[in-house]
Structure formats: C-alpha cells, structure tokens
C-alpha cells in the first residue's frame, strides 16, 4: 500500500493485520497476474495461469444470472439505479476479490469505489473479525503543460466508542513529484471537493448507525494465516504448491512435445554430390539441400555409411493423467467437486439431478461465495442510503432488497421437456412454452396458437359431419 506509513501517522493509528498477510496477498496476486515466484527461464518453467482460471470460474458461477431488486419507495428506485449502473461490474469485482481475498465497495459521493487490500489499511476490528476502523488511500494525477500534480487523499472511517457517532476524516495532499505525499491542501482544491474534511453521523432518530459505510467481501474459508483476521484469504492460497506442480507438469509436457520432432542422422558421404571425391569430406561440413529434420554426420566408414532415424516417443497420455490428477486435487482443495477441472471434456448427456449429485461440493462452495457477496451488497446499499440522507440525493423512504441467482445445475433440454409435459397435461398454456423456449413474445405466441386453432376449425370438402 502506497503511503501506508504516512496514512497511519496522519491519524495516529496502527494496523491490526500483520505483515505476513501482506506477503501472502502479494504472493497470490502475483500468481493471479501470471507472475508466480516459481517461473524460471533457466529451468523452462512457465505458467498456464490457472490461478486466474480458478477466480474466473468462481466469479462466473457465483454471479450467474444475478439480479438485485430494490423495492419500496422513491428512495428504493434511486438505490436501484445506483446498483444497475454497476451491474456488469459484479463479475469483475468478484474475480478480483477471489484473487485478493477481500474487497471493499464504498460510496464516494459521486460513484462507488472498488478497493483491494493495497488501497486500504484496517486499524480496528471487533471480536468477530468485522472491520470497525479503516484508512483508505486514493490518488489521482493532473497533467499541465510543464508539470504534473499528484493528489493524495487519506480517508479514515471509525466509530466513536463514547458517543456512538460514525466519524469520517478526509486529509488531502498535493505533490509535484511522483511517490511523494507532498504538502497538505484544502479538500476544496481537489476533485473530492464535494466531501467534507470531517463528518460525524448518526441516524435521523439519533441512534448510532448499524454498520460501516461500505460493503466488504471476504472469501468464505477461514484464514489460517492470521486467525480472526478481518481479511480473507485468496481462494487458491491453499493450493500454491499444487499450482506450482501443475505449471511444472505442463512445462515438461510442452517441452517434450517441442523436442519430439523426427530427426534423421545421415552420413555426409550419402549426401555428397555425384563425382565429388570422398577425400574432400571434412568434419562440420555444411551440406545444402537436406530437409530440416535431416542432419549430416561425419564418421561412416567405407561401405558402411552411418544412417539412423530418431522418432521420440511421447508420454502424453501419462503426463495428461498426472496433470488431471493435479487439476482435480487443486479444484477439490479450493472447494470444487473432484474432477471438476480436467483437460479432457466430459462426454454424454448429464441430467440436472446427476450434476447436483456429482457437484454437491461445488454447489455448496458457490452458495457460500454468493452469501458473502450478498452481505457485501447489503453493506454497499446501506451506505448509499445513508449518503442519500447526508447529501439529499433522493427522497427519504424505506427499501427492501432481494437477490436472485441462476441455478448452476440448470439443464435447458430437461427443462424444455418438463414444460412440454405441463402443456400436454393442460397444466400450462402453450404460449408460455413458446415464449420461454422459442424466443417469441407473448403476442407472437398467442397469435400462432390462434392461427393453428383456426385452421383446425375450417370445414372439410364435404362440410361438417
């Protein structure tokens, strides 16, 4: 975290998290960004970036068909608008959160700040590991014709234990040199001019606020690096050694494939032009016209010129089996069902019931992640509601939030067959089936059904019998 020391000194506070946690998070973020510490040009060890795959898949499943609905009043409509503006950021935010273990969503008066652990320092927490004091660092740069100005803001959130007030303190600085805090300046001279230097807040009825004015996402697994830490662990922190083994196995397999080219070693006497004296043979002599896989060698004698074909045998099947074992073990330790990640695709039809049975561990893991995401969104919406009161952004009113997620075991063909049975049995209207599975509007589906029914009622050639 840039200016960590200066930010803590500004408010005379100390971090409650250890340096070890900073190291763990940095190590994991390097793996996520395809820069794991085990990369080696000397030993030809590369990475397939599977740490990102784990985060990406977790975020994809957890945000599948996510819907956040806020109802109840004009205030609720305003809150809904704020969430809808960021709808397509949910998956991205969650992927980064899985990589870093923690993220914070905080209203800033004009929008929403997304913050990873390198942008904040936790300075207080309760016995349950909930954040009760935190310092945020924010920066931006202004470029002029001859120079640049670097602006920094330290923002301190905490509760006053004596009065129950929620306190926010903002301190701003400007420097003409990158990497320096610079001199203090009034907040009105920065882009944060809409904020106040010091704010104290309680509810309109004078009661203390119920929670901090931001949402916190923390991965669901317990932190075994720092017990009762307010920070979560990256989802793959427990499999770094296995990720290293996976990269080594992949690199060895790729190296073997690269070196598997067919080679023919042929005596240079066999490649000499007709009529050229044998006495002109020389060691290291280049012979033009040979294919790229043929190499001339010097050493044959008389009527026994040297010739040998080398066709390296690949151990691909064995190596793929080993890679799949690593993948399965990695997935299981992260929270996925055994065999969820494999190189070879699954074949055959799988019903939703089978998927639910086979992937029960995956389903539970994703549910846990969704629960944590819901709690984070609840915190964000609560903070937006308080800011709306503070700055008069929307009319006062009640709101209620509901969350809906897609079923990760959903099978469209199975659902189609079930709905068609409903239609045949008279339990559902046919137009609903066509709307749901054929992409028709309600009007189009009803018109098609009416047309078909009309054709069936037309009289035959000899009239109605």
Question: What does each of the following model-derived ranges do?
Answer:
Residues 1-145, 464-465:
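Extended, helix-rich architectural segments
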Residues 22-45, 298-333, 350-375, 400-433:
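Extended, non-catalytic structural segments that build the interaction scaffolds
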Residues 75, 82, 86-90, 238, ...:
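Short amphipathic alpha-helical segments
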Residues 104-233:
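Extended, regular secondary-structure scaffolds
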């Amino acid at each position: 975290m840039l200016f960590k020391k200066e930010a803590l000194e500004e408010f005379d506070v100390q971090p409650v998290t250890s340096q070890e946690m900073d190291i763990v998070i940095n190590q994991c973020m390097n793996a996520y960004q395809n820069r794991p510490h085990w990369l080696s040009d000397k030993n030809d060890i590369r990475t397939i970036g599977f740490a990102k795959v784990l985060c990406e898949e977790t975020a994809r499943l957890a945000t599948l068909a996510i819907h956040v609905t806020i109802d109840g009043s004009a205030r609720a409509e305003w809150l809904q608008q704020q969430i809808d503006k960021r709808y397509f950021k949910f998956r991205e935010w969650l992927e980064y959160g899985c990589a870093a273990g923690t993220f914070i969503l905080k209203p800033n008066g004009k929008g929403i700040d997304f913050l990873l652990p390198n942008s904040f320092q936790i300075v207080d927490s309760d016995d349950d590991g909930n954040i009760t004091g935190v310092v945020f660092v924010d920066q931006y740069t202004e470029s002029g014709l001859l120079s640049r100005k670097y602006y920094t803001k330290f923002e301190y959130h905490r509760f006053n234990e004596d009065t129950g007030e929620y306190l926010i303190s903002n301190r701003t600085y400007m420097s003409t040199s990158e990497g320096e805090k610079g001199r203090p300046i009034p907040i009105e001279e920065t882009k944060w001019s809409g904020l106040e230097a010091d704010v104290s807040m309680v509810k309109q009825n004078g009661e203390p606020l119920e929670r901090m004015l931001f949402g916190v996402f923390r991965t669901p697994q317990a932190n075994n690096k720092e017990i009762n830490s307010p920070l979560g662990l990256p989802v793959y922190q427990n499999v770094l050694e296995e990720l290293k083994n996976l990269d080594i196995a992949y690199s060895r397999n790729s190296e073997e494939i690269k070196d598997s080219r067919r080679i023919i070693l042929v005596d240079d006497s066999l490649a000499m032009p007709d009529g050229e004296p044998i006495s002109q043979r020389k060691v290291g002599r280049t012979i033009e016209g040979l294919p790229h896989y043929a190499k001339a060698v010097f050493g044959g004698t008389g009527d026994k010129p040297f010739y040998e074909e080398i066709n390296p045998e690949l151990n691909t099947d064995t190596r793929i089996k080993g890679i799949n074992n690593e993948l399965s073990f990695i997935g299981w330790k992260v929270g996925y069902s055994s065999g969820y990640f494999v190189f070879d695709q699954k074949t055959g039809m799988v019903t939703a019931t089978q998927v639910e049975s086979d992937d029960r561990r995956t389903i539970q893991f994703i549910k846990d992640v969704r629960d944590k995401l819901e709690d984070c969104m609840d915190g964000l919406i609560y903070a937006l509601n308080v800011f709306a009161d503070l700055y008069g952004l929307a009319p006062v009113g009640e709101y209620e939030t509901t969350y809906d997620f897609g079923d990760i075991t959903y099978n469209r063909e199975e659902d189609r067959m079930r709905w068609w049975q409903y239609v045949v049995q008279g339990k559902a209207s046919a137009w609903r089936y066509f709307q749901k599975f054929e992409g028709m509007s309600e009007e189009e589906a009803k018109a098609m059904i009416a047309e078909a029914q009309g054709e069936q009622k037309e009289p035959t050639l000899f009239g109605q019998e």
